[in-house]
């Protein structure tokens, strides 16, 4: 397993040399620092704790500050642990080009956009009721089960929509710009702009393929 932490910037689109338009999400992947290495002997499992994006020292309490000092690192805003990732040392700095290459497939995890309180139609795609004047309900969720005095916990009902941890699997890496710490991922990923995401090696059967060649707009203008 391999992975890295990044920040969602925006969505845009690029063209390949064959003229195909590809929608992509721009992810800023600043250098990640290895803050802790967990092993089976000491922790019972294998994992690497990564941190990215510096934050002010006065926003960190003493236990956290001591944790960062062990890795000779500045305090980090986004700290996450990636399991089954090994071969790294505390304090090591990881760049995106050290982990992934164009053409690989990844799983992206983030916190989805919060939608607030939503009804059953918007939240769970329920069908609405009859809209005639004599109808007893229009946008209600209808029956809640066969037992009158009990509603099961799994029942889909109105409530808080969004703002939940979500993972989208098997997204293709279109391009990596190491000089600007930018990664282009095909399609959309969870979360609003400037939200932090985890980019990990895919766990299902999509294998990497040859990277697509993007159209160089500057070269075409000069020609």
From Swiss-Prot:
The keyword rRNA-binding applies. Keywords: Ribonucleoprotein, Ribosomal protein, RNA-binding, rRNA-binding. It holds the Pfam family Ribosomal_L3. One of its GO terms (cellular component) is cytosolic large ribosomal subunit. InterPro entries: Ribosomal_uL3 (IPR000597), Ribosomal_uL3_bac/org-type (IPR019927), Ribosomal_uL3_CS (IPR019926), Transl_B-barrel_sf (IPR009000). GO terms for molecular function: rRNA binding; structural constituent of ribosome. Gene3D superfamilies: 3.30.160.810, Translation factors (2.40.30.10). One of its GO terms (biological process) is translation. The keyword Ribonucleoprotein applies. Belongs to the universal ribosomal protein uL3 family. One of the primary rRNA binding proteins, it binds directly near the 3'-end of the 23S rRNA, where it nucleates assembly of the 50S subunit. HAMAP family: Ribosomal_uL3_B. PANTHER family: 50S RIBOSOMAL PROTEIN L3, LARGE RIBOSOMAL SUBUNIT PROTEIN UL3C. This is Large ribosomal subunit protein uL3. It comes from Mycoplasma capricolum subsp. capricolum (strain California kid / ATCC 27343 / NCTC 10154). The gene is rplC.
